[in-house]
Amino acid sequence: MNLQTATSQEVEDYLKTCTGIILPTGSLEQHGPVGLIGTDAICVETIALRAAEQASTLVAPVLNYAPAQFNLGFAGTISLSAQTFSQIFTEITTSLMRSGFDRVYVLNGHGANLAPLRSAVHDLYLKHDEAAPRVKIRNWWDFPEVNVLRQQLYGEWEGLHGTPSEVAITQYAVRSVTRENADPPRALSKDEIRETAGDYHGPASEHRKNFSDGRVGSFSELAEHEHGGQFVTAAASALIEEFRAFVKE
């Protein structure tokens, strides 16, 4: 069930049997020459709604405005400060708590969301202690089944941004953008992979200079529509299993 298309009475009825909700979090930022600006949001929303269809879970609207300052050198990117993002998440979660939800499962699609999300959760626990809803944060690509598939299909060319796996999901869910005879991006060193984990990048001008076409070690053009369906199926199945266990804790 989708929260924004549900009635208040339907939510009350849902809460009689389940007090958990899935909150997808994404971003609005460039994703390379063939990646859609809303890629992160599209991925988590598609996976979450598939899970909801199969398991009758409730899904909140995707939080798609997020910290992405490092991509502001590319047209169309919209960025919030980490502080603003954290505050919005806190107020969403507090509102859900007042409705009676005590489990909020965050399905995340954007690495730079992780630090402010975790900070906000600590503050919720500090303020409300045991009354605070329990929060679980999971990147969709970290499900073991999904990660195995990513490596099988793309290996090292999965990279870090504009990944073929996320592009494949948008091809499956929305549309494909083609680019003939595309060259692979510059491969990342182990140091770069370690230092930029969680989208920990420098300022926008520096980032555009280092990654001129927006791809960060990812050969986006390896994505295929069929792959997207495989990723959605695998991720939704893993999400259902983990969500069910979470709400029983």
Protein language model annotation of sequence segments:
Residues 1-103, 109-249:
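Extended, histidine- and acidic-residue-enriched regions that form the cofactor-binding/catalytic faces
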